[in-house]
Amino acid sequence: MANGANALKVRGFQTVCSDQQRSLIERTPEGLYCRAAKAWVDPWRPVPRALITHAHADHARPGCGEYWAVASSEGVLRQRLGKDITLHPVAYGEEHWLGQCKVSFHSAGHVLGSAQIRLESEGEVWVVSGDYKRDDDPSCEPFEPVRCDVLITEATFGMPIYRWQSGEQVAKDIHAWWSGDRSRPSLLFCYA
């Protein structure tokens, strides 16, 4: 790392910022915290205000005071976290002021209701990608490129050793498996 640079390390990944650039997002024991919004993005522990990138269990955890997420993820979030959670469903691109920060959610193309979270304060724009997918997927809105000064990106399967079949090929394989023996019930497990 160059002299005069600070790094925000997040579970093995880092974002490098110049000394002149303040950190809009910082790592805390609860997760990624935006002090200007008084909110955590996909917190690891219960917090007063959570901004949720999508409804999968590794991003949306129970016990938070309030949740902000894309409206199309509401059903899954309430099923997983409880029907009585305090949830603020938002539309893609809709801007909300939380504290001293303008917050908006933009499609990540990962699953239904998945979002990148854009945070803007004092002329700086940071984006937390959450999980994202750039391939076409009829089950969700396509990935939306979002201009920013700093991008904090998920990279779980970003290494070159991971190569995936196209969604179309996976669908064909599932159909072939299912139609291979129609006399038997078929049960397909998936992660949510």
Set out the residue ranges of the language-model regions.
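His/Asp/Glu-rich metal-coordinating catalytic cores
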Residues: 17-45, 49, 55-191
